[in-house]
Amino acid sequence: MIDIIINRLTGQVVIKVSPNEFTFSWRGKSVKIKTYVHLFDDNGYYRILGIGEDFEGSSRCTRVELFSEKLPPNDRILRPELLELFIRFGLQKIIGRRSIMRPTVVFEETHNIAKILSGYQNSVLIEAAYKAGAYSVQIN
């Protein structure tokens, strides 16, 4: 019963996965977000200044590609944490507000990042989605 209520209030957010961009779809609308994050080094603490978009001044930031074989420039930059924030950003952008009810997230085409994540893509995506606020997660 609770699943029916949650589905009516939030529905499913479908995320189509590719190394260069994720496509978030919900209730007939979709948004594409490139899979990189701009970080600014503030005396040893990194601040996220942009997700999936370049902006004026982004050239002075550290750009971290979430699904690149190239390692981030600093070992304190953790891609799983950035992936969680990336998914949270995408969920908020597609739903358009902070949802009272947490959505069900459905990932599609996860095989597109299998090589980069050595076959652990489903586990990585599921964990990131739950941490980003998903009620439940499915892999199609």
Label the model's feature ranges:
Residues 1-140:
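Nucleotide/phosphate-binding catalytic cleft detector across ATP-hydrolyzing
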